[in-house]
Amino acid sequence: MPKAAGDAKLLIQSLNKAYAATPTNLKIIDLYVVFAVATALVQVVYMGIVGSFPFNSFLSGVLSSIGTAVLGVCLRIQVNKDNKEFKDLPPERAFADFVLCNLVLHLVIMNFLG
């Protein structure tokens, strides 16, 4: 087996081992972020196949999905117990910030739709 393939296999095994120790609430947030990014990718593929006639609708959908994913990553950073920067921030406050920012994001997206 080539050295690069062995290194890649070792890297994947170490990532799987480290991710197995991740708390369940962080795994749920990760799943949410992956779903939001997958939704954006589906919208881009759909636009490539069918077309983007109401371009502002396409742009709103993609920006909403990507914005939601970014806010999900921010929530994950704030809720992570290993992150020393946000150790004094309670998870309830982080979730309230996430909900409020999502509300503002989607109000802006709805305004952009017209």
Swiss-Prot record:
Keyword list, A-Z: Apoptosis, Endoplasmic reticulum, Membrane, Transmembrane, Transmembrane helix
GO cellular component, one term: oligosaccharyltransferase complex
Any Pfam family matching the protein: DAD
Keyword Membrane annotated: yes
Pathway stated in the Swiss-Prot or TrEMBL entry: Protein modification; protein glycosylation
Coiled coil: none
Any GO BP annotation: protein N-linked glycosylation
Localization terms from the record: Endoplasmic reticulum membrane
Classification via PANTHER family: DOLICHYL-DIPHOSPHOOLIGOSACCHARIDE--PROTEIN GLYCOSYLTRANSFERASE SUBUNIT DAD1 (PTHR10705:SF0)
Protein name, per record: Dolichyl-diphosphooligosaccharide--protein glycosyltransferase subunit DAD2
Organism classification: Eukaryota, Viridiplantae, Streptophyta, Embryophyta, Tracheophyta
Gene: DAD2
